[in-house]
From Swiss-Prot:
UniProt-recorded name of the protein: Bifunctional protein GlmU
Organism of this sequence: Limosilactobacillus reuteri (strain DSM 20016)
EC number per UniProt: 2.7.7.23, 2.3.1.157
Reactions it catalyzes: alpha-D-glucosamine 1-phosphate + acetyl-CoA = N-acetyl-alpha-D-glucosamine 1-phosphate + CoA + H(+); N-acetyl-alpha-D-glucosamine 1-phosphate + UTP + H(+) = UDP-N-acetyl-alpha-D-glucosamine + diphosphate
Cofactor, how bound (note): Binds 1 Mg(2+) ion per subunit.
Length: 455
């Protein structure tokens, strides 16, 4: 197999996006468009990848890191000019080079591999990736002769009525013999209405030189979808979302309503997990086997182990261990770690805290900056008072402790194992094992006093 190179065109600003964010950095299912392209090229085992940057160069480079080399296009003078900027990095290389836009996030590694194979088998100088468009309006058309050989690419504005009826379109992806690509680039001019150097002119030059120019027709038109505005971005998200959901269902995940299930590209989900409608799973979340994710849940960058049940709750950078459950309407914030077989009920919030195996936190509770041991009962309305107005402080609760309803644990404080906090207490001092802490005023009943009250 010959050496394979790739060029990603990512220098455009994308004014039609109407955004301060550079076009290729807009996200599709939780990953920037240009990163989608790069990931698929990596999967296709490309030897050498160069990304052409322009507007927002530093931001793009920060996003992609060392996964690719970079070439800078300081002036936006067309796609041909962009590829010329890779001359120092690529012109002397042997092999084949694929060129793809950074705003086409739906292409797959399989398509890139098939394009390379088709190109190499025919010993072509250039191969155009084409597709059949249901509505080809706006696309360049592929004009073939009577025996199916590619004659030229004609743009919409230049096409005759007969040519406009052609449904085979140019997807904007090309595979070139690398040496012949750069030889032809040296011959293109900017003698056109836009004053730009067009990559498509390379095709014409190669045809004039009687080089072999072919076209590989891919099956899935959706892959070729480019994103130039927010409408197209929404469409791309929908296509990618369907692809992601279909993948996980085929891997053994049940989705009650895939149309309303939103899963990012880097999420991982185990078998026999059930996901209800209206669920959003983002970032690098990992979900184990046999989990149940209830309607309306939102999970971001969290790790969910096997057999976990989440009902209408929000998790951010949290972890839930085997057999634990939460919800409805509770919130795990960053650095919350829930141990095995822990129950977190409704309207609870946990932040920067560890809750040990078998502990139960039923309802209406805030736990922040705390470590809780095993088999603790936390009653309704308990507040871990962690903030003194300046600093956050830590609370420790030992194994088998009992925290009565409507109690406040004022940090820093240590509730020893096997100790008991009476309901309604405000605890400011630590306890010893087997202590029962009561911190509330003694009740006084004043006879007949209610008769004096105005109500």
């Amino acid at each position: 197999m010959t050496k394979r190179n790739a060029i990603i065109l990512a220098a455009g600003k994308g004014t039609r996006m109407r955004s301060k964010l550079y076009k290729v950095l807009h996200q599709v299912c939780g990953k920037t468009m240009v990163e989608h392209v790069l990931t698929q090229l990596e999967k296709a085992k490309i030897d050498n990848i160069i990304t052409i940057v322009g507007f927002g160069a530093e931001t793009v480079e920060q996003q992609l890191g060392h996964r690719t080399k970079y070439a800078l296009q300081e002036q936006q003078l067309g796609t041909g000019h962009a590829v010329m900027q890779t001359k120092d990095l690529l012109a002397n290389e042997d092999g084949e080079t694929i060129i793809v836009s950074g705003d086409t996030p739906l292409f797959t590694a399989e398509t890139f591999e098939k394009l390379f194979e088709y190109h190499e088998q025919r010993h072509a100088a250039a191969t155009i990736l084409t597709s059949i468009a249901p509505d080809p309006t706006g696309y360049g058309r592929i004009v073939r002769n009577d025996v199916g050989i590619v004659e030229r690419i004609v743009e919409q504005k230049d096409a005759t009525v007969q040519e406009q009826a052609i449904k085979e379109i140019n997807t904007g992806v090309y595979c070139f013999d690398n040496k012949k690509l750069f030889a032809a680039l040296s011959k293109i001019t900017n003698d056109n209405a836009q004053g730009e150097y067009y990559l498509t002119d390379v095709i014409g030059i190669l045809k004039q030189e009687n080089e072999i120019v072919t076209a590989y027709k891919m099956d899935n038109f959706d892959e070729s979808m480019g994103v130039n505005d927010r409408v197209a971005l929404a469409r791309a998200n929908k296509v990618m979302r369907n692809r992601i959901n279909t993948h996980w269902m085929r891997e053994g995940v049940s989705m009650i309503d895939p149309e309303t299930t939103y899963i990012d590209a880097d999420v991982k989900i185990g078998r026999d997990t059930v996901i209800e409608g209206g669920v959003v799973i983002k970032g690098h979340t990992e979900i184990g086997n046999d989990c149940y994710i209830g309607a309306g849940s939102r999970i971001t960058d969290s790790k969910i182990h096997d057999g976990v049940k989440i009902i209408s709750s929000t998790l951010q950078e949290a972890e839930m261990h085997n057999g634990s459950d939460i919800g409805p309407n509770s919130h795990l914030r960053p650095e919350a770690e829930i141990g095995e077989n822990v129950h977190i009920g409704n309207f609870c919030e946990v932040k920067k805290a560890y809750i040990g195996e078998g502990t139960k936190v039923g309802h209406l509770t805030y736990i922040g900056n705390a470590t809780l041991g095993k088999d603790i009962n936390v009653g309704c309305g308990v507040v871990f008072v962690n903030y003194d107005g300046t600093n956050k402080h830590h609370t420790n609760v030992g194994d088998h402790a009992f925290i009565g309803s409507n109690s406040n644990l004022v940090a820093p404080v240590n509730i020893a194992k096997d100790s008991f906090v009476a309901a309604g207490s405000t605890i400011t001092d630590s306890t010893e094992q087997y202590d029962m802490a009561i911190a509330r005023a003694r009740q006084v009943n004043k006879e007949n006093y209610a008769k004096k009250l105005p109500w």
